[in-house]
Amino acid sequence: TIETPHFVLLASMLMLCVAIVTILFWKRDVAVIRRGVLVALFLEYLFFVLSETIFFRDVMETRECHLELFWNYRLIREDPAAANGIWEIILNILLFVPFGLLIGAFGFKKGKAIIIAILSGFLLSSFIEGSQYYFHKGVCETDDVLHNSVGCLLGLGIFWVLIRGIKIIKK
């Protein structure tokens, strides 16, 4: 049987594909097509992230909040059994890499793109952490906000490297 969250995510991917195909065949202007595809990808990404972090998470009995910055690192250093926390850090960074890629793809100037990546990564992550706390859907952690913001900047950097590589190949 297909679990409800997986079904909803599959359905949203199907809707994304339909939206992109519709945009590609409806509009002839390349800039309009690019913008439409980016908006569709951004909305799908946002839905995926919110589904994974809030919508389809189990409700916890109590609220938990860790506002001390770098508490994960201290825990990992002090308790070798908590080494799986490294994976949590890596996954939090990776979760926001696509967000940074999309910010880069929207074509902002470098300085503005960096500011947008930092602010939007911080704000989206803060919204998620606050919602997890409010709705009992996870532990609210400042470390997660930091790691997500780093992931967003990393995604932006990856975008710039990809674009530079494409320009070199085209020459």
Predicted feature residues:
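Bulky hydrophobic segments
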Residues: 1-136, 142, 156-171
